Each structure stands twice: as C-alpha cells, then as structure tokens.
Amino acid sequence: MFKKKLGMTLVEVLVALIIGTISVAAMFYSYNIFNRSYQGIVEKASISKSGRNALSQLARELRNVGYKDINQLQAPLEEYLWKENNVSGFQIGSDSLRIFYDLSPKERIRIDYKLKKYQNSQDTFLSRSFYHWTCTSANNCPVRKEVDEVFINNVEDFQIEFKDDTGKEVKPVNFGAGKANQQRVKSIEVYLTVRSANEIFKKNKNWKINNADQTYPKNDKYTRETFFVSVYPRNIVMN
C-alpha cells in the first residue's frame, strides 16, 4: 500500500513567492512613508522649540539694552544699540545686531547677534557673542568673560527693525552717524527664519519668505518656519 505524499506544486510555490514579495514590498513602502512622516514631525517640532526658546531669551536681553547704572565705574553708557543692514557674504542679506547694558556698578554686558557659516558649508546659523566687563576700580574694567556660541542652528535669515513712537522705521541706528537715533527707538522687531536640518519633502517645494524689508525665494525639500517678536526697550524709553 502506497502513502500519498502531500506537497506544493511549482505553480503554488511561485504564487506564494509572489504574494510574499508583494507583502514585503508593501510593508517596506509603508515603513518609508511612516518614517518620512515621523521625521518631518520631529524636524518641525525641533524648529518650533529652538525658535521659541531663542526668541524668548533674545527678548529678555533686548529689554535690558541701554540700562545705565548711575554708580557705574566705567564711563557712562552712551553707545548701546547698533545694527548693520544686509550683511554681505551670505545667501541672503541678513542683519547684525549689537547691544550694551549695565548689569551692576561694576559690570557691563555686550552681546552680538549675527549669522555665521558652518565650516566648509554655505549653510548658516545665528551666533551669539557675549562679553562681560568687570571693574576692579574706576575705568579699570577688563573683559572677564567672553563666549562665542551657536545660538540657533540652521538659521537662514535674521532681520531687525527699529520703530519710533509712531510706528515708522528708525534708521540708521549705530555708533556713528546714527548715534542720535538710538533715543528714538521705541520698539524692536525681530524676524527669524529657521530651516530644517534635513530634507523632509519628496519633491521640491516653492517658498517665498518675507521678513521686514527682506524677501527671498527658495525651492528645495526643506521645511521652514519664521518667528517674530516685538520688544519694548524700556530702558531706552527712560534714557
């Protein structure tokens, strides 16, 4: 008596193989879609968090600009707000900002904000340079602390506008011909455009960014977010 051996025919094997291949391909495709979507969410969350945190700190420092301690051991603070328009050397003409304020009778602070390029790259970040003078006696005030740091990564544009009490732009504002205009500044507007670190779109996307007096187009696979804050410089108003 012969036993019947059960098995799969060649056609059945081929059908099973095809179905398995399709299933694996479908799972791989679904994973890619999910992964790209997840990475996009992570990138956007990172941009939003870094932008909000940076603007919060920047706003606090702008509120201090121009504060003069009446017992300051250095010469009275007369130059405290400076801006350079459309700094060259970048993809986009960004601004550069410098502020001063007294921290105590013995201490004075200077902070510079401007775009810088990463090494061997055209991409830019917003840098923050911090200088801290500490006086040991009258007019003997060496820099005790100096910090140059990456304030926000992947910043494409940084724009500053100074407004007077009628809402009109004040310019120039610097330590030369625009020195007298420091007193006219009643609000400081900051525009900051941050780009994602990685590409997140499958196809290029058109962008048109409008920040203060700066407008520029982009066509790529990155996402972006622009942040804005308007600050009341209370110490300038009191000067």
Each model region followed by its residue ranges:
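Residue-level marker of positions within ordered structural domains that often coincide
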Residues: 32, 63, 67, 104, ...
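Short amphipathic alpha-helical segments
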Residues: 71, 94, 132-134, 232-239
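Surface-exposed loop/linker segments characteristic of extracytoplasmic
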Residues: 77-166, 187, 224, 228
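Residue-level detector of alpha-helix boundaries and kinks
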Residues: 42-43, 140, 216
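Short linear sequence signals and composition-biased patches located at protein termini or domain-edge surfaces
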Residues: 46, 147-239
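Short, aromatic- and cysteine-enriched interfacial helices/patches
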Residues: 1-2, 81
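Short, glycine/acidic-rich hinge or "gate" loops at secondary-structure transitions
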Residues: 71-77
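Aliphatic-rich helix starts adjacent to a transmembrane/signal segment
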Residues: 2-69
